[in-house]
Amino acid sequence: MLPYPQIDPVALAIGPLKIHWYGLMYLIGIGGAWLLASRRLNRFDPTWNREKLSDLVFWLSMGVIVGGRLGYVLFYDLHAYLANPTLIFEVWKGGMSFHGGFIGVMLAALWFGKRNNKSFFELMDFVAPLVPIGLGAGRIGNFINAELWGKPTDVPWAMIFPPFSDPAQLPRHPSQLYQFALEGVALFVILWLFSRKPRPTMAVSGMFSLCYGIFRFAVEFVRVPDAQLGYIAFGWLTQGQLLCIPMIVGGLVLIWWAYNRKPTAKPA
């Protein structure tokens, strides 16, 4: 069994002002995505400057934060937030939904693309390889917060999370680290290598959707479902897995479509 590192969720406190690691992980994810996007910008559109890229990253970040929070409220704990709506704004306590953030990013990309003469999938193909940086950073934030841990286990790398998080004090799968390894590291490597060669429009977006859906679906088998929801069906299907099914199917469809559709005829 491995010891859980006791890390204060508050990274820095100045008087009443507290800066949480969870929030810093979002800043790291956004900053890392911007740096990587800067490297890939010339291939994407040589006419774009850093200012336009910064605008894109800003609006996508708003999509992540607003969509992620509203997604958690709608998908995971609607009754609690309806009873006390002020809880919606306490983002530093956790409670973000990837699937909600994903929807927020898609809406932001759709809006930004229309304003800047870019198709939705052109932007999504450009953005997809940037996303694992934020996903990986977010999972480290979950780990520091001692939240979203896994089921009891006797594997050698099991961890006992703090009593405030797990009163049962059982050795558990550190599922946040599994997700960091898969959604952060593995997904980044796959998309980075896949997108290095020219791909038809929608292929990179499809690969992201497919791989994320598979990775998340797999980890959910060892992750404890949200207490207020439990299992949705069959005694094992979680809300996270249910939301991943359309991502897996959609990813397969996009990849097939990208490689099999007829090229659009260009006007003479």
Curated annotation (Swiss-Prot):
Record's GO cellular component terms: plasma membrane
Molecular function terms from GO: phosphatidylglycerol-prolipoprotein diacylglyceryl transferase activity
Record EC number: 2.5.1.145
Keyword Transferase set for record: yes
Keywords, alphabetical: Cell inner membrane, Cell membrane, Membrane, Transferase, Transmembrane, Transmembrane helix
Main location: membrane
Keyword Transmembrane helix: yes
Pathway: Protein modification; lipoprotein biosynthesis (diacylglyceryl transfer)
Sequence positions that bind a 1,2-diacyl-sn-glycero-3-phospho-(1'-sn-glycerol): 139
Function: Catalyzes the transfer of the diacylglyceryl group from phosphatidylglycerol to the sulfhydryl group of the N-terminal cysteine of a prolipoprotein, the first step in the formation of mature lipoproteins.
PANTHER family documented for this protein: PHOSPHATIDYLGLYCEROL--PROLIPOPROTEIN DIACYLGLYCERYL TRANSFERASE, PROLIPOPROTEIN DIACYLGLYCERYL TRANSFERASE
Family recorded in the similarity comment: Belongs to the Lgt family.
Protein name: Phosphatidylglycerol--prolipoprotein diacylglyceryl transferase
Organism of derivation: Pseudomonas putida (strain ATCC 47054 / DSM 6125 / CFBP 8728 / NCIMB 11950 / KT2440)
